[in-house]
Amino acid sequence: MAITTTMSFRAQAKNLAEAKRKTHLRKNMNTYYVYIMSNKRNTVLYVGVTNDIERRVAEHKNHLLPGFTARYNVDKCVYVEDCGSIEDAIAREKQLKGWSRAKKFDLIAKFNPDMKDLSEE
């Protein structure tokens, strides 16, 4: 049986702390997205946030989740913006939700003037 010295306990604690720090940083390096969905006639806008844009858009398109987007047939992704953290994404989502329809359409027009479904490109 090996005897562990105080020094090796400190080294182990340091290594554990470093591993936890790296894991925490990896979690913070995830990309989060703020997106805007619309319907075929572009009469409805829905603003949302996700960490998996492909999955989330597929959920909207296939009406897998009951609610606003299923009720109003929102199935076209017209705007996507990536954010560095979930906090930034939620703050941006709230900001966009507070905007008028006209301001949201202006934002979309800067990046997607034809209101194409970005998930099909």
Q: What are the residue ranges of the model-derived segments?
A:
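Arg/Lys-rich, alpha-helical DNA-contact motif
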Residues: 100
